[in-house]
């Protein structure tokens, strides 16, 4: 992929319904960071900050136009991204991530040199979850990455549990309908009442 690097740190219906629920991708475990920034020196600096941290894998994408494809590949639990990039500006990229069903809920932390309150407010208004001025302290960056990832993983686990519960409810409803049909088939046909 151009401009992106990874640094890995019963009834037939019943089986069908359960298979559909089981085919959903499980929620991500651990912390997977995707950094989108056109400056390789920033990519290297962030990689060094996160290296050695247990449970964190880091992926870097230099080309903002390849960011969605890279995100689909690595399934990040948090996205760090710059605002000023040549192909696609950072605010537009936030909009692209939020418009894509796959990444709608993935936390986005803007990592930028811009400190103006109006820029920060706009980033939050279009869907960024956090805003850090480059380059933050290592401990702060790790804390924010872990915090946002924890929230995202909890959301995915909740959604997975809800999907499984809904699939189970549907299986029970189908089983009840099948049982009701069977019981009705055992009953004698209704008698017509005639006049006496």
Where do the language-model regions lie?
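Two-component/phosphorelay signaling modules centered on CheY-like receiver
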Residues: 31, 40-59
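Active-site residues of response regulator receiver
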Residues: 37, 82, 112
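The feature encodes the CheY-like receiver
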Residues: 42, 77, 86-87, 95, ...
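Active-site beta3 strand of CheY-like receiver
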Residues: 74-80
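C-terminal output helix
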Residues: 118, 135-145, 149
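… and, occasionally, acidic/histidine-rich disordered N-termini of signaling adaptors
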Residues: 164-196
């Amino acid at each position: 992929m151009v401009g992106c690097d990874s640094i890995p740190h019963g009834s037939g219906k019943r089986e069908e319904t359960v298979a559909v629920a089981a085919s959903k991708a499980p929620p991500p475990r651990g912390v997977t960071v995707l950094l989108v920034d056109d400056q390789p020196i920033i990519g290297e600096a962030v990689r060094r900050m996160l290296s050695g941290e247990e449970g964190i894998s880091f992926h870097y994408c230099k080309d903002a136009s390849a960011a969605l494809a890279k995100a689909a590949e690595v399934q990040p639990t948090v996205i760090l991204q710059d605002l000023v990039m040549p192909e696609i500006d950072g605010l537009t990229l936030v909009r692209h991530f939020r418009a894509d069903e796959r990444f709608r809920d993935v936390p986005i932390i803007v990592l930028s040199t811009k400190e103006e309150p109006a820029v920060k407010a706009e980033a939050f208004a279009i869907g960024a979850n956090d805003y850090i001025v480059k380059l933050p302290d290592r401990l702060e960056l790790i804390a924010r990455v872990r915090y946002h990832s924890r929230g995202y993983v909890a959301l995915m686990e909740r959604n997975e549990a809800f999907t499984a519960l809904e699939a189970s409810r549907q299986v029970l409803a189908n089983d009840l309908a099948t049982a009701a049909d069977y019981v009705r088939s055992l009953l004698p046909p209704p008698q017509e009442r005639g006049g006496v």
